[in-house]
Amino acid sequence: MGREINQRKAAIIGCGFVGSATAFTLMQSQLFSELVLVDVDFDKADGEAKDIAHGIPFAGQMKIHAGTYEDLSDAAIIIVTAGAGQKPGETRLDLVHKNVAIYESIIPRIAEQNKDAILLIVSNPVDILTYTALKLSGYPENRVLGSGTVLDTARLKYALGEHLSVDS
């Protein structure tokens, strides 16, 4: 802590499907000059970083690399995608106990390194995990954001459109 925040640096915690897709999207967006990928499996994060880096010549300039929690100290935004995958027949609420346990191990480590970043929570169930991250991090409320329920809204609109035979 005590380092100046780099407003053009982002970090992603969790390099599964969502984390990797988020990293690729951020690389294409050119919003950041540096992106750090952190995962419990460093080699996985390193492989994802290298794969995405190969697309940089077509998108602009960005430094993308695997890192550790220490690399979060100057990140402006930390996106948390880590969590257990949802199994067939399992509801998002079934994920609560698994993902809260995961958050209990990672959120304090994030907060140790950086108290000034914005935390963007993406893992499901996002509302409960956003609250969990808020409590575990000690961050002020305006610095812990959840990705919301846009996907749920899209699914509902689609289902209603199908049921009513109208465009969604």
What are these regions, as identified by a protein language model?
Residues 34, 38-76, 90:
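Conserved N-terminal Rossmann-fold NAD(P) cofactor-binding segment
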Residues 23, 27:
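Gly/Ala-rich phosphate-binding loop of Rossmann-like dinucleotide-binding domains
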Residues 82, 121-168:
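Rossmann-fold dinucleotide-binding core
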Residues 1-8, 32:
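A short, basic/flexible loop-to-alpha-helix module at the beginning of a structural domain
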Residues 15-16:
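Glycine-rich Rossmann-fold phosphate-binding loop(s) that bind the pyrophosphate
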Residues 28-34, 138-141:
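Conserved S-adenosyl-L-methionine
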Residues 88-140:
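Rossmann-fold NAD(P)-binding glycine/threonine-rich loop
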Residues 19-20:
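N-terminal Rossmann-fold NAD(P) dinucleotide-binding loop
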